[in-house]
């Protein structure tokens, strides 16, 4: 099911709440709802993900690849937003990812264990209200510890 109608990507990011809504739509509708069309719609062609694996292309294609790799490793992955904050063109999102580790993640083959992975994401948006940059700080050490 596509949720492109959830927000109008042609509307300029005129207020902090507009871009916060885009980040909320990414996590709740695109990521949790497995909607690659929405990821494509909210991602600018010049999008750069500072946490992507080497060789990941920029733009919507790369953004979708990163998400699909995560879904392959944790097929039931679900992200719960704890806090959203924005200033001008930037949104910070703090939350926790939950799911079952079934495929390779951070170099570790699937364990079948439930995971809880705390994360902080930064998104920057262009004047068209599309994401142009992503960076993240994740508790990878805590996650790796849970794999033991």
Where do the language-model regions lie?
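C-terminal and inter-domain tail/linker signature
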Residues: 1-148
């Amino acid at each position: 099911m596509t949720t492109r109608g959830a927000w109008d990507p042609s509307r300029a990011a005129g207020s902090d709440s507009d871009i916060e809504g885009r980040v909320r739509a990414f996590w709740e509708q695109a990521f949790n709802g497995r909607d690659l069309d929405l990821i494509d719609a909210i991602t600018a062609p010049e999008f750069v993900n500072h946490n992507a694996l080497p060789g990941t292309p920029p733009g919507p294609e790369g953004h979708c690849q990163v998400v699909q790799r995560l879904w392959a490793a944790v097929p039931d992955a679900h992200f719960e937003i704890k806090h959203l904050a924005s200033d001008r063109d930037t949104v910070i999102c703090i939350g926790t990812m939950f799911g079952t580790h079934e495929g390779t993640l951070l170099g570790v083959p699937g364990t079948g264990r439930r995971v809880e992975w705390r994360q902080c994401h930064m998104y920057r948006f262009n004047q068209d209200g599309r994401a142009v940059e992503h960076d993240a700080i994740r508790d990878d050490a805590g996650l790796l510890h849970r794999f033991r």
